[in-house]
């Protein structure tokens, strides 16, 4: 930019030194119309200029001056739009009521900065040499405003000179963002939005169509570089990557250099096979050459070309190529209004000798080979009408006309220098003008932002294109007017294929973020949309997912379920046990007076059966979804019921030991201690105390154990110590029972209750000894089943050893269920025991004492447990 400023200073110095050089001498063309207020116009009547040596006057013997070539019909069309707009304004009541007219002086910029500055120099000096016939000088009015130029590059250079005189400049097509900076360009205004809106709209279009791998082509200069900078800024923000950036030379004069750049650009496009969308801010003539180069290459024909306003309506590009050769072209154009009057003006325009005299641009236009006659000239102008450009020019003229009227209402503006350019500039910044019934005004940056139309090119030679969408900067959104766009929507422009749900993108270091590989999400992570940057984590407290998952799944609650086959089997065994208990209880109640029932404990049998019922019922609370209540109830019910059972068995063991104890002293002691219900209550009381402390201090509770795919619901015993005390206490009672029963293991064969108690307690002890390591090492939902199995083994062990033999005698061996059979069995047992003792002591086994008690003469030779007497029947029964 500093280099451009220096060039401008040098150029102004040169221009200041050659004020005497006439326009005719430097081949400068123009169109002039008189008026009270003069407006300057700068339009690209030619597309290029090349410098040639020119012999000047005075101190400058020679210097380089550009000569224009490559006639640009669209530029003439824009100049005619200004002429028509001025004529319409002069005919309006707004100006005619003040008896004012607008005049103009229009010059050709030749699409060249230097040529444009020559024109500005001529516009801003008090005298002009425009009469090519007489070369005479005549005083002219100073210009009050300038309309144009179209190119941002040229507008920037022109604006810097006009800023010095504060002459308002209104461009109808310059969109460079830098021109909105009022601190640098205070006199510049425009009737189009700046490129910041256009690049944002383009990126929004790319984003909406998921085109993330694109290329950009610009023409070198302030406009192109500013547009590329703005475009890249927006793409980075939206995650879109630019695969390549091509900068074509600004000058069109050096065709050899231009062709080299065009061929290099074709190579780049051909190499980037995955880039199917290209955004271009280049000149239309350069795009024409590019398309001609692509036509002969092996380049996919389904590309989408996004055209900036710089060439979006220049359909002369398709003169030698078809859309089928290059793809689809989407063009961004400025929104326009009704320009029917201008089209009619072109039809009515006379292209005779009078027109040639007043307009040198028309004179050259009519000499073009493709024109030939006036009819062709009209058709060519209509074909090259850019509706958006025409409307923008008309708005610029309307704004100036309205501002002039507002200034001249209270002053005589027909007097020269009645108003100054800076006054008009100030008025323009605040003016509100009407066109086609719509009110317009400039914003704080001096811009009028109407938005954009998005057009889709077709092969029709007319300049009209199919408008498919409208873009509104106020809400950064598109409104599509055409729904069927499959040929556009089906185009893919991505560096990498989309990652599917369940995958995420991983970009290698140093690569574009749009070039990546797709990796599967890990376990307990997911991605639920395509092209996810990262995988989201599942809430592992309640959710889970497999690898490569697109969503999280709720964890199911896991517990020892009712419908589990194992649970059904255990519950069936518990139910059978309850049926057995009920049956045995009924049988024992019916035979309550029989010797077998009395010998088995009488009322204690029913108490044992009741306790076993509670133990079987506790199994139910180990199955199903646990709760705090079930966790507490199940252990307490089992603990208390089995304590009651073992306590009753302990009483039975003491009774048997008392009945068959032959040691009189020990027998007397046992008789004093034998208080059945007191013993049962004491044993139960201690267990109740343990359970109460447990439930009070460290009560069991439900615990949720988070597992990879489920949540295990299990009972936490609260205190392993209290749980161990409860079970340990029962084990202690069982050991005592086992000890007592073991001492009476050799009782009468048909009444060996102690042996059955021994087996029952042995089964219980073995089951619970196995339970401890299994319970500690087992985890999962079947932990409750382990305890249930042990409970059932214990219950069935007691049923089998204590009650089934009695039931067998009652039902099948009724002859043993008599007092005589029972006494016979007992006395036989006592006799054999005495004989064994006498044999050990050397006494005659047939000798008897008077009190019917066998006396051992040398008791020290016999162990204490062998010293027996005839049992008392009452203690047994």
From Swiss-Prot:
The chain crosses the membrane at residues 568-588, 604-624, 636-656, 677-697, 721-741, 756-776, 783-803. Changing residue 309 to L: Almost abolishes L-Arg-affinity. Changing residue 47 to L/K: Induces a mild reduction in ligand-affinity. It is a multi-pass membrane protein. The record marks 389 as: Important for basic amino acid selectivity. Residues 1-24 form the signal peptide. Pfam families: 7tm_3, ANF_receptor, NCD3G. Changing residue 78 to A: Induces reduction in ligand-affinity. The keyword S-adenosyl-L-methionine does not apply. Changing residue 223 to A: Abolishes L-Lys-affinity and strongly reduces L-Arg-affinity. Changing residue 388 to A: Induces a 26-fold reduction in L-Lys-affinity without affecting affinity for L-Gln. GO terms for biological process: sensory perception of smell. Homodimer; disulfide-linked. This is G-protein coupled receptor family C group 6 member A.
């Amino acid at each position: 930019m500093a280099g451009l400023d220096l060039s401008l200073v040098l150029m102004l110095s040169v221009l200041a030194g050659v004020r005497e050089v006439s326009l005719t001498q430097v081949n400068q063309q123009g169109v002039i119309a008189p008026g009270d207020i003069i407006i300057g116009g700068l339009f690209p009547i030619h597309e290029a200029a090349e410098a040639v040596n020119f012999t000047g006057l005075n101190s400058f013997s020679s210097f380089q001056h550009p000569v224009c070539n490559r006639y640009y019909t669209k530029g003439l069309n824009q100049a005619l739009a200004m002429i028509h707009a001025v004529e319409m304004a002069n005919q309006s009541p707004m100006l005619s009521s003040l008896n004012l007219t607008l005049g103009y002086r229009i010059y050709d910029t030749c699409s060249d900065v230097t040529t444009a500055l020559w024109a500005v120099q001529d516009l801003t000096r008090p005298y002009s040499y425009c009469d090519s016939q007489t070369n005479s000088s005549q005083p002219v009015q100073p210009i009050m405003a300038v309309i144009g130029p179209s190119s941002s590059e040229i507008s920037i250079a022109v604006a810097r000179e006009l800023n010095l005189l504060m002459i308002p400049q209104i461009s109808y097509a310059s969109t460079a963002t830098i021109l909105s900076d009022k601190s640098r360009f205070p006199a510049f205004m425009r009737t189009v939005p700046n490129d910041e809106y256009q690049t944002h709209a383009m990126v929004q279009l790319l984003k909406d169509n998921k085109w993330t791998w694109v290329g950009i082509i610009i023409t070198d200069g302030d406009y192109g570089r500013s547009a590329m900078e703005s475009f890249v800024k927006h793409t980075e923000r939206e995650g879109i990557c630019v695969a390549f950036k091509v900068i074509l030379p600004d000058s069109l004069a050096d065709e050899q250099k231009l062709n080299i750049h065009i061929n290099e650009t074709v190579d780049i496009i051909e190499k980037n096979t995955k880039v199917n969308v290209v955004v271009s801010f280049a000149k239309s003539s350069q795009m024409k050459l590019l398309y001609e180069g692509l036509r002969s290459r092996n380049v996919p024909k389904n590309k989408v070309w996004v055209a900036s306003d710089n060439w979006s309506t220049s359909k002369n590009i398709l003169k030698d190529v078809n859309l089928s050769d290059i793809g689809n072209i989407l063009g961004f154009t400025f929104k326009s209004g009704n320009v029917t009057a201008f089209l009619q003006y072109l039809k009515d325009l006379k292209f005779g000798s009078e027109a040639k005299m007043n307009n040198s641009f028309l004179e050259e236009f009519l000499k073009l080979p493709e024109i030939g006659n006036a009819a062709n000239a009209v058709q060519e102008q209509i074909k090259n009408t850019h509706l958006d450009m025409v409307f923008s020019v008309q708005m610029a003229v309307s704004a100036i006309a309205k501002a002039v009227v507002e200034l001249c209402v209270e002053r005589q503006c027909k007097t020269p220098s009645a108003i100054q350019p800076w006054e008009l500039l100030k008025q323009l910044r605040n003016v509100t003008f009407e066109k086609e019934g719509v009110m317009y005004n400039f914003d704080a940056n001096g811009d009028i932002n109407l938005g954009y139309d998005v057009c889709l090119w077709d092969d029709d030679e007319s300049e009209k294109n199919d408008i498919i969408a409208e873009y509104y900067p106020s809400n950064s959104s598109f409104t599509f007017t055409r729904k069927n766009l499959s040929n556009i929507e089906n185009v893919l422009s991505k560096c990498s294929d989309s990652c599917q749900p369940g995958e995420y993108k991983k970009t290698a270091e140093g690569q574009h973020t749009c070039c990546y590989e797709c990796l599967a999400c890990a376990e307990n992570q997911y991605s639920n949309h395509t092209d996810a940057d990262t995988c989201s984590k599942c809430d592992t407290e309640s959710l889970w997912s497999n690898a490569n998952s697109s969503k999280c799944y709720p964890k199911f609650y896991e517990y020892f379920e009712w419908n589990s086959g194992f649970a059904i089997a255990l519950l069936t065994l518990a139910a059978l046990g309850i049926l057995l208990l009920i049956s045995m209880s009924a049988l024992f109640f019916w035979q309550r007076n029989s010797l077998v029932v009395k010998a088995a404990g009488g009322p204690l049998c029913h108490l044992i059966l009741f306790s076993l019922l509670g133990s079987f019922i506790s199994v139910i609370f180990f199955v199903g979804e646990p709760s705090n209540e079930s966790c507490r109830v199940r252990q307490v019910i089992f603990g208390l019921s089995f304590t009651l059972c073992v306590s009753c068995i302990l009483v039975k063991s003491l009774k048997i030991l008392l009945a068959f104890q032959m040691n009189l002293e020990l027998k007397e002691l046992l008789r004093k201690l034998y208080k059945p219900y007191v013993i049962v209550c004491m044993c139960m009381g201690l267990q109740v105390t343990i359970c109460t402390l447990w439930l009070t201090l460290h009560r069991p509770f439900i615990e949720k154990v988070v597992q990879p795919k489920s949540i295990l619901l299990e009972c936490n015993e609260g205190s392993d110590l209290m749980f161990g005390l409860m079970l340990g206490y029962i084990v202690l009672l069982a050991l005592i029972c086992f000890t007592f029963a073991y001492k009476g293991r050799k009782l009468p064969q048909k009444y060996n209750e102690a042996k059955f108690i021994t087996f029952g307690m042995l089964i219980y002890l073995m089951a619970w000894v196995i339970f401890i390591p299994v319970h500690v090492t087992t985890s999962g939902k079947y932990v409750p089943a382990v305890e249930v199995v042990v409970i059932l083994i214990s219950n069935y062990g007691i049923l089998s050893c204590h009650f089934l033999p009695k039931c067998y005698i009652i039902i099948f061996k009724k002859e043993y269920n008599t007092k005589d059979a029972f006494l016979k069995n007992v006395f036989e047992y006592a006799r054999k025991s005495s004989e064994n003792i006498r044999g050990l002591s050397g006494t005659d086994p047939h000798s008897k004492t008077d009190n019917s008690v066998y006396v051992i003469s040398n008791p020290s030779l016999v162990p204490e447990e062998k010293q027996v007497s005839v049992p008392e029947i009452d203690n047994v029964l």
